[in-house]
Amino acid sequence: MGTVNNAIRDSVLFTTADSIINWSRSSALWPETFGIACCAIEMISAGCARYDLDRFGVVFRPSPRQSDVMIIAGTVTRKFAPVVRRLYDQMPEPRWVIAMGTCAISGGVYNTYAVVQGSETFVPVDVHVPGCPPRPEALMHGFLLLQEKIKRSRALAGTPLDRVIAS
């Protein structure tokens, strides 16, 4: 029974449909305009004319219901983490998360009881963009890594993917 399902899943029809679906998903990433701290300034500058994320198909959206990418850019406190999780839950499937900056990845220099030590404790993070704050080029590289991850996924088979760390 398992070999028949694998043969159907790996057939030409499904792999072609997967590649078309993944191409369209990776070519139109709509991140939510959501910045918490100083990394948000670099995220804003990445959307301006000098770096122009629009050429990668990245268009910032004002609502979580219109977004498929969440960029956590900055320090998340324990009081604010449920709000971020609620915004994540309001996003339609499929959805991805980019943790931008040292504070979003590991809590940064704020090793206190009030700061969450990493965004992966309350949302699944797909791409990590390190830096304090990371340059707009690093965020662009993170989007390119996310696009490659989406292209490698199997949309119709439902295969889970590994997490990616931008270096």
From Swiss-Prot:
SUPFAM superfamilies: HydA/Nqo6-like
Signal sequence segment: none
Cellular localisation: Cell inner membrane
Protein's GO biological process: aerobic respiration; electron transport coupled proton transport
Keyword terms: 4Fe-4S, Cell inner membrane, Cell membrane, Iron, Iron-sulfur, Membrane, Metal-binding, NAD, Quinone, Translocase, Transport, Ubiquinone
Plastid is among the record's keywords: no
Gene name of this polypeptide: nuoB2
Function summary: NDH-1 shuttles electrons from NADH, via FMN and iron-sulfur (Fe-S) centers, to quinones in the respiratory chain. The immediate electron acceptor for the enzyme in this species is believed to be ubiquinone. Couples the redox reaction to proton translocation (for every two electrons transferred, four hydrogen ions are translocated across the cytoplasmic membrane), and thus conserves the redox energy in a proton gradient.
Membrane topology classification: Peripheral membrane protein
GO cellular component: plasma membrane; respiratory chain complex I
Protein name (database record): NADH-quinone oxidoreductase subunit B 2
Record note on cofactor: Binds 1 [4Fe-4S] cluster.
GO molecular function ontology, one term from the record: iron ion binding
Family: Belongs to the complex I 20 kDa subunit family.
Pfam family, one: Oxidored_q6
